């Protein structure tokens, strides 16, 4: 282990029994942890910026697996046709990846499907507020100062994205239809549970997971990867 890796201090957050996630800056991940050979090879043909977020997300996932006692070692992190990541060597584990403007996130669920999303706040059009939020919440958000409106909307949309990732549907799952009340830090939607960990994340993050027994080993569909 390198000296930088030995100084790695990120510790997983536990959303539920068997569901863990990590969020970190890409530069911190790549500065502290080695990139696995399969990930480096897979990123070889990508533009530099895309290769950085690709390898950072997968490196963070491998670190998360080690920290939770599920060390993947050099095993592959593959992607289904829709982009959803999975572990060919560990079909019992659901995984999810996300990246946004220098941040990466990874989640793992034992015997569950999981979805993770991270979003740096950005300008929000009035139409998007009306699409993703209840009329009351859209009105409240519109009245907020710009910076607050961007951040609060990002907390909502990360949960919506995480939910459709956990289902494996991606955008075809119409994330804007997932009801996420303004300011709420946890909730349920159909067979999913979700959390928006406002108290301990510096950037808006959403994590969603299924109940045990809902996991679909061969589940395809989209869901985005890093």
Report residues per predicted region.
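Core catalytic alpha/beta fold that binds nucleotide/phospho-ligands
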Residues: 1-226
């Amino acid at each position: 282990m390198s000296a930088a890796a030995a100084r790695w201090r990120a510790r997983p957050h536990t959303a539920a029994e068997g569901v863990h996630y990590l969020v970190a800056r890409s530069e911190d991940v790549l500065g502290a942890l080695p990139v696995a050979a399969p990930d480096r090879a897979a990123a070889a043909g990508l533009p530099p910026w895309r290769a950085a977020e690709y390898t950072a997300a997968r490196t963070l996932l491998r670190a998360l697996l080690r920290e939770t006692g599920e060390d993947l070692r050099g095993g592959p992190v593959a992607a289904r046709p829709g982009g959803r990541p999975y572990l060919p060597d560990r079909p019992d584990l659901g995984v999810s990846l996300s990246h946004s403007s220098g941040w990466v996130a990874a989640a793992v669920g034992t015997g569950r499907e999981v979805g993770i999303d991270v979003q740096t706040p950005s300008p929000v059009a009035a139409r998007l507020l009306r699409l993703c939020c209840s009329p009351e919440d859209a009105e409240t958000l519109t009245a907020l100062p710009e910076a607050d409106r961007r951040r609060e909307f990002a907390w909502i949309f990360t949960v919506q994205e995480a939910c459709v990732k956990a289902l494996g549907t991606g955008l075809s799952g119409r994330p804007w239809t997932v009801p996420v009340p303004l300011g709420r830090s946890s909730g349920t939607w159909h067979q999913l549970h979700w959390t928006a960990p406002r108290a301990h994340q510096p950037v808006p993050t959403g994590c969603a997971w299924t109940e045990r027994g809902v996991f679909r080993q061969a589940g395809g569909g989209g869901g985005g990867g890093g």
